[in-house]
């Protein structure tokens, strides 16, 4: 995953899925705030 935007919601892929990655919590554990109930 890209170390550049991995903090925003890079989501294991390398795509800038900010809203999806952060909200869904599929940010490879690199999300700043893991939302409860995010699959």
UniProtKB/Swiss-Prot annotation:
Q: Which GO terms describe its biological process?
A: regulation of blood pressure; vasodilation
Q: In which tissues is it expressed?
A: Expressed by the venom gland.
Q: Name one GO molecular function term.
A: toxin activity
Q: Which residues form the propeptide?
A: 1-8
Chief subcellular site? secreted
| Cellular localization per UniProt | Secreted
Q: What is known about what this protein does?
A: Snake venom natriuretic peptide that targets both NPR1 and NPR2. Exhibits hypotensive and vasodepressor activities.
Q: What family is reported? A: Belongs to the natriuretic peptide family.
| Protein's UniProt name | Natriuretic peptide CnNP-a
